[in-house]
Curated annotation (Swiss-Prot):
Family per similarity comment: Belongs to the class-I aminoacyl-tRNA synthetase family.
Motif 'HIGH' region positions after renumbering to this chain: 123-133
NCBIfam families, alphabetized: argS
Coiled coil: none
GO cellular component: cytoplasm
GO molecular function, one term: arginine-tRNA ligase activity
Name of the gene: argS
Protein name according to UniProt: Arginine--tRNA ligase
Catalyzed chemical reaction(s): tRNA(Arg) + L-arginine + ATP = L-arginyl-tRNA(Arg) + AMP + diphosphate
Subcellular localization(s) per the UniProt record: Cytoplasm
Length: 563
């Protein structure tokens, strides 16, 4: 649907063009009002235009307002030096809610749907997933849900680390210790540590490991059989975690691109992009002080070669219009070099197709990198299990009489919701402090607050014997709390646009938290059952329920009908 912001931008753009036809097209600065008493939205362009038109901002604002039709607004006011404050009429808000209700059910479809590839999670075979994989998995899943909701064709790729020197070490160790079949990732992780120690200390073991890497690349039957067993055990463990998190991924590991590596290097050489540096083949770029190494001096390939091959495949074979890779911000330089190389080679048709969705660290309550006391990465499965147990403790504290059946059902939902929301509500670029105590609170900007508002609406339905509130019919907005709730509901597609434009889920969490606050104020100030406005207010309850449910789904959160 046309958002309130885009509708207002269109009106102001036309008004500016009519008032000042000599101006070229400009990007307008229209935002939600900084304070509610100013109105709903404000236009800040008069100050910017004053430098171009050599007129006072207030005179410019007056000229703009003179060309804006008054119909959709209850007031248009010029404030201060030349801010234009807009307040939509209650009748206009009510009519827009009718449209919003219809389109919410179908998703706010993008005008030009695209093929979007989102590469996220990407753990390494033979290693436990740890807290560092949490952000990539949760952020990537949220973005995938949002792109899908607006009609894009999304391919969720798990670019697992399933190739390289580590497998030569493991295969050699398994061969030499005559290990029986491995069924648990814990066993594999322990073997990896032993193999790594041997690799560092024993030069003969190192040579045999390197030989096994070559054997694996050459398709040696025994090496391949062991490699497949290692991958199978690891992927089974990963899938357990993805099931807990309700995350879907299509696995396409690094090994998938092996057949294309030599071809990619040769193609880059044919385009005169490769320079030898100390025997290694590198791609240099003027804008960067270091190159992207695509082939080592010993002839081996590295993860950069794989990433170039993956980018080319995703454009040429997958026909991607957008490619997002969700990894920590520490890899930013690598992905800048990767993009520059793929642009130079023509694998990326233009800038803006590829985005590195970087994110900060997870910290403990002391502000240190989140690790165990012994300094090791915290295993993700253990973290999730702890969240569920702490959620159950919180439930028992609030409801001592809760049944074991309810506890077993609600605990996992509350625990996983809390972890996801705490992560997504932090700006992804920033580090954030992981605190079970904060994320499981029933008040403040938490998953519990959203769920509490949703459950409150379920309570209204139960008391009134309704399966669902009305989703169509006459609607009027009278009271200030109704107006505030209506305006917030109508901003949902606008916030979704912002979330996808900036690739930042915290815009969506902030919106949903604001929506719960507006609904709670509406519930407090506007009597529903038996009032003259019962149907209209139930309509608002229903729209809030559906918007909360949709928004929570986009975050990967689950709802409950009661707490």
């Amino acid at each position: 649907m046309t958002t309130l912001l885009s509708f207002l931008t269109s009106l102001c753009s036309a008004a500016i063009h009519q008032a000042f036809p000599e101006l070229e097209e400009l990007t307008l600065d229209i935002t939600p009002s900084t304070k509610e008493h100013f109105g709903h939205y404000q236009c800040n362009d008069a100050m910017k235009l004053a430098r171009v038109l050599h007129k006072s901002p207030r005179a410019i604002a007056e000229s703009i307002v003179a060309h804006i039709p008054p119909t959709p607004f209850s007031s248009i006011e010029i404030a201060g030096a030349g801010f234009i404050n807009f307040t939509f009429s209650k009748e206009f808000l009510a009519s827009q809610l009718q449209t919003f209700s219809k389109e919410l059910a179908n998703g706010f479809r993008a005008a030009s749907p695209q093929k979007v590839i989102i590469d996220f999670s990407s753990p390494n075979i033979a290693k436990d997933m740890h807290v560092g994989h949490l952000r990539s998995t949760i952020i990537g899943d949220c973005l995938a849900r949002c792109f899908s909701f607006v009609g894009h064709d999304v391919l969720r790729l798990n670019h697992i680390g399933d190739w390289g020197t580590a497998f030569g070490m493991l295969i050699t160790y398994l061969q030499e210790t005559s290990q029986e079949a491995i069924h648990q990732l814990e066993d594999l992780t322990a073997l990896y540590k032993k193999a790594h120690a041997r690799f560092a200390e024993d030069s003969e073991f190192k040579k045999r490991s390197q030989h096994n890497v070559v054997a694996l690349q050459s398709g040696d039957a025994q090496a391949l059989a062991l490699w497949k067993q290692i991958c199978s055990v690891s992927e089974k463990s990963f899938q357990t975690i993805y099931s807990i998190l309700d995350v879907e991924l299509h696995t396409r590991g690094e090994s998938f691109y092996n057949p294309f590596l030599a071809e990619v290097v040769a193609d880059l050489e044919s385009k005169n992009l490769v320079t030898l540096s100390d025997g290694a083949k590198c791609v240099f770029h003027e804008a960067f002080s270091i190159p992207l190494m695509i082939q080592k001096s010993d002839g081996g390939y590295n993860y950069a070669t794989t990433d170039v091959a993956a980018m080319r495949y995703r454009i040429q074979q997958d026909q991607a219009d957008r490619i997002l890779i969700v990894t920590d911000s520490g890899q930013s330089l690598h992905f800048q070099l990767l993009e520059a190389t793929c642009l130079a080679a023509g694998y990326l048709p233009s800038k803006g197709i590829f985005s590195h969705v970087g994110f900060g660290l997870v910290l403990d309550t002391q502000g240190r990198k989140f690790k165990t006391r012994s300094g090791e990465n915290i295993k993700l499965r253990e973290l999730l299990d702890t969240a569920v147990e702490k959620a159950k403790e919180s439930l028992k504290a609030h409801r001592p009489d809760i049944s074991e059946e309810e506890l077993a059902y609600q605990g996992p939902i509350l625990g996983i919701n809390a972890i996801k929301y705490a992560d997504l509500s932090s700006h992804r670029i920033n580090d954030y402090v992981f605190s079970f105590e904060k994320m499981l609170r029933f008040e403040g900007n938490t998953a519990m607050s959203l769920l509490y508002a949703y459950v409150r609406i379920q309570g209204i339905k139960r008391r009134m014997g309704l399966e669902s509130p009305p989703q169509e019919g006459p609607l009027a907005v009278h009271e200030p709390a109704e107006e505030a709730l209506a305006l917030t509901l109508l901003r949902f597609p606008e916030i979704l646009d912002l979330t996808l434009r900036e690739l930042c889920p915290h815009f969506l969490t902030d919106y949903l938290y604001a929506l719960t606050n507006k609904f709670n104020a509406f519930f407090r100030d506007c009597h529903i059952e038996g009032s003259d406005s019962q149907q209209e207010r139930l309509y608002l309850c229903g729209l809030t329920e559906r918007t909360l449910s949709t928004g929570m789904h986009l975050l990967g959160l689950k709802t409950l009908n009661h707490l």
